[in-house]
Amino acid sequence: KLNRDADVAGPDVDGNGVRDDLDAYINSLPDTEPQKKALRQGYRVLRNLLLLDTTDTTAVLDGMRNSAASIWCIYSRYGSDANKKSGEVEKYTVNTEERFKAYARFNAAASGHSAVMPRGDGCDE
């Protein structure tokens, strides 16, 4: 069951940057461990985008770079299923009005800027 608290961050008891409900979802998947790591990176990065100070241009640009890397990582680990997986990351993370508004603020702040695709597969691990 997805967390729908008014809190944008949501619970993260283990402090890995991924909401606990999404961590449980990832753990329940039959995917490979490298694929699960890619999903965790995607969920962590998107959660961070919702929480960053959108008045800080450096933070926004860093967020854009991290987002591009996490998407590239998912594509490198999932191949033809990557588009579906990337869509799930967004759908499951931005699942309340408060989170949607935070995501809209980030996207508005990022508008007009460009990000460079990462070197390699974009994966943290």
Where are these regions (language model features)?
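Calcium-binding acidic motifs and repeat modules
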Residues: 1-15, 21-125
